[in-house]
């Protein structure tokens, strides 16, 4: 009884919008509603022709679609991805906002974009708001250089998987210690941390993030350390050089 449910998905948004705009034809576009290939194509065709008035969807409606008759776009929880523990979170948020906002006003009629955010003064949101690509790139590169993130330094993400949480954590901490002993001080070796998606498909996941400039040397030293450190049968290790995401 003390629990309060918050948040919403596309289905809840669809029903709420349909209730508020009773005369409008509302359609939802997400992975659950677009199980057939034809459903995706038919929905886009109906929306483009004006048979659908309001389209509610996930990121799948953000990219590469041209709707000349769209004059209003609303983005709910625009900063959701911004708070993920990933150095590219800001970049992805800026990219998504720019893409979604670009759906409005593509015809002769000017468009408007409404953005819902808990952190409206975030650089990603403010630069997207002002369509300032150059400004965003400059501040993002300054941040990356200050923190030794790509493209100024290389990053290597090591993920340790195990069905047994304690065994996986112990193996990760042992590997981290061996890496720190083997690598020169010029390479940064972060402490072991649970992955943001800590358990996936029955496997507990732990991360070790490394950063350095000489990627060939770093990769070789990681490989040599792993070769000298046998892992339990139920522990797997994955190495991702310059990972696209840290989840």
Describe these PLM feature segments.
Residues 172:
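Flexible catalytic loop/linker elements that gate and position reactive groups at enzyme active sites
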Residues 1-169, 177, 181, 185, ...:
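Inter-lobe coupling/hinge segments of SF2-like helicase ATPases
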